[in-house]
UniProtKB/Swiss-Prot annotation:
Compartments where found: Cytoplasm
Keyword field: Cytoplasm, DNA-binding, DNA-directed RNA polymerase, Metal-binding, Nucleotidyltransferase, Transcription, Transferase, Zinc
A Pfam family hit: RNA_pol_Rpb2_7
Protein name: DNA-directed RNA polymerase subunit Rpo2C
Swiss-Prot/TrEMBL catalytic activity: RNA(n) + a ribonucleoside 5'-triphosphate = RNA(n+1) + diphosphate
Cofactor note: Binds 1 Zn(2+) per subunit.
Primary localization class, coarse: cytoplasm
A GO cellular component entry from the record: cytoplasm
Gene name of the record: rpo2C
Organism of derivation: Methanocaldococcus jannaschii (strain ATCC 43067 / DSM 2661 / JAL-1 / JCM 10045 / NBRC 100440) (Methanococcus jannaschii)
Length: 636
């Protein structure tokens, strides 16, 4: 650090300015010395920023800190004696922290540190030494093998997608009633593993399978990260999973002695659905186990008393009309009833939980990813007999595109495929831990010793023609993860359905049976093509058409009086018969436009609409003929 004694340096404690000093280096070294002696809390950190000329001392909670070995005069304070004592159990890791052998640094103080990866790299300038290079990475990134050979964004993607991968996260899934669960049928331990996995116990709860991967283009079906799958491998169970969803219902009690009831609702109940929706319910109003249900089917029949007191008061002379409050399967989902559990809540109300099971076999559009951020969706399934095969008869499980490798620089995946091949042939696990895994040349030598070419490529033959490919194909074993993003949970279409209360436009989203938004950019395309009728159809007729009568005299909305059979304008007093349209014609506009006009009125702006005669679409041909005749007359 440069000597800046002539300048006053600001001192901040947890972001608050507490004072200044003209000897920043002495202060920083003094605080670090006190921390190492145990006179200050071990998680206290101090950082001196020369550029901004300030010292930050942090003691607050919520900071990420990590342990490092302290280095003084080019030598680590951790000795062989410490390690022997640790092995014998005479001292603990906490004792090393108290002695100042190991200290915790946060992100801010790490900027002042010069950290060596290994003891061989240590110099006089180094301040700290990594306990092990693998501590650089967190849990998500540490699971990926050979991450030092990948670009940083791909490691970040791999860490994010690892959290979405399917496996068996707990051993009691058969008895659990989670709101949602998705489990892989045959998870495998990865052939190429890391030390992070051992520490985490990943092998006990793996989340993926070892795929035989070939890197080659296949008739254009694996362009843009699509993946070609071996259909026979899928039939044997590759990537198969089960999705569970739990629905629950409770018999609530209400003031006045009324309560919900589990039953098959009568036809007279308010909100009664069609008979077909209740077909799987048994006498007690609860669905039968192993029934196949789909979206909209009732799985727990339930009726409730009138929602508001006014409803009950209206029907007080008659028997109060109950309403249907049954539990239905979500729109777009289906499955078999796996389990039904009847129990009670703390208040003593009956509670029923229904678990629905759905088998998810990989299909076109399902998302898969390697541990190197190479994600893709299934683009084609091909029978095994039509896929390329090697001289030894190996057929790949998946084929990925070669264009996915160069620009993304995921060399770690190529090394994993090489290591997976060696591990499968030798029957052992390969270590792919960051900076300390098995070296590339060792894997190449092992392949040569096994009778394969050191570069991992093999001669392959076309499954359809039997002809040998002109080039050798890179083939190996990589660990692939099936992700939760399946096409079955995303596919959506709608012809008609619910609309919003305010705008009267279709609802949004798959869960609400919503429409597909026709946005500004799509609108501009139709304008550019001059497709006026299609534009009108999309933006009004199929969205929120609204018939309203407008006064042709003042241009404001008129009022319909169906009882008297009249239309009248509240502004200028124009009156007209309901079936006439000379003074107060009917106009079809988008309801959103009517809402806009109402909102303008609320801000004391009165918009007026000019109304003219229109040409009916049915009479358009006659109208054109008249124009043509008039043109002919004018020429004569």
């Amino acid at each position: 650090m440069k000597n800046l004694a002539s300048r006053e340096v600001n001192i901040y404690v947890n972001g608050k300015l507490v004072g200044t000093t003209d000897k920043p280096e002495e202060l920083v070294n003094f605080i670090r010395e006190k921390r190492r002696k145990g006179e200050l809390p071990q998680y206290t950190t101090v950082a001196y920023n020369e550029e901004s000329n300030d010292i930050h001392i942090n003691t607050d909670a919520g900071r990420i800190v990590r342990p490092l070995i302290v280095v003084e005069n080019g030598k680590p304070k951790l000795t062989k004696e410490h390690i022997e004592k640790l092995k014998k159990g005479e001292i603990t890791f906490s004792d090393l922290v108290k002695e100042g052998v190991i200290e915790y640094l946060d992100a801010e103080e790490e900027e002042n540190a010069y950290i060596a990866l290994s003891e061989e790299e240590l110099t006089e300038k180094h301040t700290h030494l990594e306990i092990d290079p693998l501590t650089i990475l967190g849990i998500g990134a540490g699971v990926a093998p050979y991450p030092e050979h990948n670009s940083a964004p791909r490691i970040t993607m791999a860490a994010a997608m690892g959290k979405q991968s399917l496996g068996i996260p707990m051993s009691n899934i058969k008895w659990r009633l989670d709101t949602r669960g998705h489990y892989l049928h045959y998870p495998q331990v990865p052939i190429v593993r890391t030390k992070h996995q051992e520490i985490l116990g990943f092998d006990k709860r793996p989340a993926g399978q070892n795929f035989v991967v070939a890197i080659m283009s296949y008739e254009g079906y694996n362009m843009e990260d699509a993946i070609v799958f071996n259909k026979s491998a899928i039939d044997r169970g590759l990537g198969r999973s089960t999705f569970f969803r739990t629905y629950d219902a409770c018999e609530r009690r209400y003031p006045g002695g009324q309560m919900d009831r589990f039953e098959i609702p009568d036809k007279g109940v308010r909100g009664y659905r069609s008979e077909e929706c209740y077909r799987y319910l048994e006498e007690d109003g609860i669905v039968a186990v192993e029934s196949h249900v789909k979206g909209g089917d009732v799985i727990v029949g339930k009726t409730s008393p009138p929602r508001f007191l006014e409803e009950h008061e209206i029907t007080i002379q008659v028997k109060p009309q109950r309403r249907d409050s049954s539990v239905v399967v979500r729109h777009g989902e289906e499955g078999y009833i796996d389990k039904v559990i009847l129990t009670e809540t703390k208040e003593g109300n009956r509670l029923v939980k229904v678990k629905v099971r759905d088998l998810r076999i990989p299909e076109l559009g399902d998302k898969f990813a390697s541990r190197h951020g190479q994600k893709g969706v299934m683009g084609l399934t091909v029978p095994q007999e039509d896929l390329p095969f090697t001289e030894s008869g190996i057929v790949p499980d998946i084929i990925i595109n070669p264009h996915a490798i160069p620009s993304r620089m995921t060399v770690g995946q190529l090394l994993e495929m090489l290591g997976g091949k060696v591990g499968a042939l030798e029957g052992r696990r390969i270590d792919g831990t960051i900076f300390s895994g098995e070296k590339e040349w060792d894997l190449r030598k092992a392949l040569e010793a096994l009778g394969f070419k050191h570069h991992g490529k093999e001669v392959m033959y076309d499954g359809k023609t039997g002809k040998k490919f002109e080039v050798e194909i890179y083939i190996g074993i990589a660990y692939y993860q099936k992700l939760h993003h399946l096409v079955a949970g995303k596919i959506h279409a709608r012809s008609r359905g619910p609309v919003q209360v305010l705008t009267r436009q279709p609802t949004e989203g798959r869960a609400r049976e919503g429409g597909l938004r026709f946005g500004e950019m799509e609108r501009d395309v139709l304008i550019g093509h001059g497709a006026a009728m299609l534009l009108k159809e999309r933006l009004m007729d199929e969205s929120d058409p609204y018939d309203i009568c407008i006064c042709s005299k003042c241009g404001d909305f008129a009022i319909l009086d169906y009882k008297r059979g009249l239309k009248y304008c509240p502004i200028c007093g124009e009156i007209e018969n309901l079936y006439s349209s000379k003074k107060i014609p009917f106009v079809r506009i988008p309801y959103a436009f009517k809402l806009l006009l109402d909102e303008l009125k609320s801000m004391c702006i009165l918009p007026r609409i000019k109304v003219r005669d229109k040409v009916e679409l049915e009479d358009f041909e006659e109208f054109v003929e008249k124009l043509e005749k008039e043109k002919v007359k004018q020429k004569q």
